[in-house]
Design a protein with these regions (language model features):
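N-terminal Rossmann NAD(P)H-binding glycine-rich loop of SDR-like oxidoreductase domains
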Residues: 6-26
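Active-site-lining helix/loop region of Rossmann-like oxidoreductase modules
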Residues: 9, 14, 144-284, 289-290, ...
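N-terminal Rossmann-fold cofactor-binding loop
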Residues: 33-37, 55-56
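Short, conserved SAM-binding/catalytic segment
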Residues: 42-49
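Conserved Rossmann-fold cofactor-binding substructure of NAD(P)-dependent oxidoreductases
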Residues: 53-69, 75-81
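ADP-ribose/adenylate-binding Rossmann-like module
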Residues: 89-107
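Rossmann-fold NAD(P)-binding glycine/threonine-rich loop
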Residues: 101-122
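C-terminal helical cap and adjacent loop that interface with cofactors, partners, or active-site loops
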Residues: 271-351
Length: 351
């Protein structure tokens, strides 16, 4: 069967809907898909796009839905619960796969399908959004400046905007789990916010703390640098509170606590408004050093995380549909280079 279509699974989520809305700007006509027929059909009718309704639970049914699909954009998280089924179906049907995951464990899991994906002649690219395009490109940019770098620090500092239901749900599902760093090539569990760092942006010292961001996995694949930490902007008062989170991890992992938090999430707006996104921006900072003590730094500015995710997914989709891809497991920068981020609107490298 000739495969020419793009399928966007999880189109009714906040980020999925953004991708669907912007698709026309990239000359892409996705098939919208998901489990909720009421929401998917309403969105499809509003955007005048085709749609399909199916779940990920039945492997045979899922593969049947992908028979005529060339590429899946997977936007239905949490990906720890949904990624495996879709990846395996894509490999079985020779369908390319990208997603908007940012979970370290999911990157590591999908990486194990590299050989199977190559044999099926398909590309697997988790993290084709804000997690991790800007930071992945910054990591490779620094690696090229200092090829023998042994340590990498990355930081992102959002200004304005707010998080979506989906992102908040993923965060809630990981409450009490702590953080992660990469040391000597190995993933090492750490307390959340085990380190703080003052990042110099245009002469201003901005406070950041460590978080378990996807680059702990992906930047290692992209650069081979064996020691990696990722930081995000945080108020010092919040950081001091989080330093003691380990005392409460046992209760944060309880289902009744997570259910209560999920109810609070569901009562909030789905995500930032178009106006909030238009004025929000993100600064990405990176630093590498080697055994000789030589140091290189880089600063990048880009739009808010949700806009970068939608534009980034569609840019990569456009490239894949033109045959511009590498088979097997890939990261955005390992496939498309350090300047991929500069092809996304409102992005510029400051240094």
């Amino acid at each position: 069967m000739h495969k020419i279509q793009v399928l966007l699974y999880g189109a009714n989520g906040y980020t999925g809907e953004l991708i669907a809305r912007y698709a026309k700007e990239y000359s892409i006509t996705p098939v919208l898909a998901g489990r909720n027929e009421t929401l998917i059909r309403a969105l499809a009718e509003r955007l005048q796009l085709p749609y399909r309704i199916f779940s990920l639970e039945n492997a045979n049914q899922l593969q049947q839905q992908l028979q005529d699909i060339q590429l899946v954009i997977h936007a239905a998280g949490p990906f720890a619960n949904t990624g495996k089924q879709m990846v395996e179906a894509c490999i079985a049907t020779n369908t390319h796969y990208i997603d908007i995951n940012g979970d370290i464990s999911v990157f590591e899991r999908i990486k194990k399908y590299d050989a199977a994906a190559k044999q099926a002649n398909v590309m697997l690219m988790p993290g084709a959004g804000f997690d991790v395009i800007p930071t992945d490109c910054t990591a490779l940019h620094l690696k090229e400046q200092l090829p023998d770098a042994t340590h990498l620090q990355l930081a992102f500092l959002p200004k304005g905007g707010q998080i979506s239901h989906g992102t908040a749900t993923t965060m809630a599902s990981r409450l009490g789990e702590g953080g992660t760093a990469r040391e000597n090539g190995k993933l090492v569990s750490k307390p959340l916010g085990h380190r703080s760092l003052l990042v110099d942006i245009n002469g201003k010292k901005l406070f950041t703390m460590t978080i378990p961001w996807g680059d702990i996995s992906t930047a290692y694949h992209t650069t081979g640098i064996e020691n990696i930490e990722v930081y995000t902007g945080m108020k010092p008062t919040v950081y001091r509170f989080l330093k003691f989170q380990f005392l409460f991890n046992w209760i944060l992992r309880k289902q009744f606590v997570r259910s209560w938090i999920q109810q609070k999430i569901n009562s909030r707006p789905a995500g930032p408004t178009d106006e909030q996104r238009a004025t929000a921006k993100t600064t990405v900072w990176g630093k590498v050093w080697n055994a000789k003590g030589e140091i290189k730094t880089s600063v990048l500015e880009c739009a808010d995380g949700y806009s970068v995710t939608a534009w980034g997914c569609l840019l990569i989709t456009q490239k894949i549909m033109k045959g511009d891809l590498k088979t097997g497991y890939q990261t955005p920068a390992s496939c498309y280079g350090k300047d991929l981020i500069l092809e996304i609107p409102k992005s510029k490298r400051i240094s």
